[in-house]
């Protein structure tokens, strides 16, 4: 099987002024090299603070480690830079669910669905989340959601 890492690493070193770190970090993440991916993203996000993809990949590094607050912060930063990214809002919804905040998770899924209205998967997830939040509200666990 062809290994992409050497080619990506070479390109990354050859063009240090380009934000190629996110692509290389994503590759490392897929290959299980979590700490290398995280270090690369942290450095890259510092060098390229207006590159949203770097923050989205960094959030995945944190999610893998169940570092939910750090993942939320990285996603928030990425979404401030790219506010029309439905995948970012979908992932932020997942992070909020993991943090136990169903209401904010629902708001993020609603935003993702508004940005990608043709996604059947998002529509299904949104309906499931809405049902879960309503059930929690009936038990007094969260603030009710207005319909």
Predicted regions located by residue number:
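Short coil turns that delineate tetratricopeptide repeat
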Residues: 15-16, 49, 83, 117
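Structural marker of alpha-solenoid helical repeat scaffolds
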Residues: 47, 64, 81-82, 98, ...
């Amino acid at each position: 099987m062809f290994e992409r890492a050497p080619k990506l690493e070479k390109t990354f070193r050859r063009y240090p002024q380009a934000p190629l770190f996110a692509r290389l970090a994503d590759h490392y993440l897929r290959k299980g090299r979590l700490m290398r991916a995280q270090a690369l993203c942290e450095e890259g996000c510092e060098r390229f603070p207006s590159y949203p993809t770097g923050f989205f990949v960094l959030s995945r590094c944190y999610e893998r480690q169940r570092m939910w607050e750090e993942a939320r912060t990285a996603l928030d930063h990425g979404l401030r830079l790219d506010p029309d990214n439905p995948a970012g809002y979908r992932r932020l919804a997942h992070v909020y669910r993991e943090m136990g905040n169903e209401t904010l998770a629902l708001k993020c899924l609603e935003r993702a669905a508004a940005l990608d209205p043709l996604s059947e998967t998002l529509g299904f997830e949104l309906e499931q989340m809405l049902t879960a939040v309503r059930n929690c509200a009936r038990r007094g666990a969260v603030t009710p959601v207005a319909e």
